[in-house]
Amino acid sequence: MERILALDVGDKTVGLAISDELQIIVTTLNTIFRTSKLEDRDKLKEIIDQYGVKTLVVGLPKNMDGSLGPQAKKVKKYMDFMRKNIEGIEIVYVDERLTTVSATRVLIDTNVRRENRKKYVDSIAANYILRTYLDMQRGKNGE
């Protein structure tokens, strides 16, 4: 099996989380602070190469009715650029409704100061996204 990388793409940051090779354990990675698409691509490619990733699981922020809103369209456009500029990766989208809310709640519950939460919230959201994806895959395979 291979490691899978999850992304929580925002306007200013990209939260990251990665699975182990057995796709059981999910670990948060440092958040990428977005600068330009080319620099973001280089940072992302470095992580992909470092961990031997072939699949990116990307949170798609759907509206509560399941439709794609403006932010979801931005995410898809951003990831279309990455798909065209990073060879050999598969991109899978996962509904990420309320993951940032859940991640923020965890940080509040663990007494992380308000000014420090932004450093962690996107990567924790990516962790939720990847765990959701892995749970769905296990359900499909009857595990």
Where do the model's predicted regions map?
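Conserved catalytic-loop position in the HRD/HxD motif
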Residues: D8
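Phosphate- and other anionic-substrate recognition elements at nucleic-acid/protein interfaces
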Residues: E2-I4, K12-E143
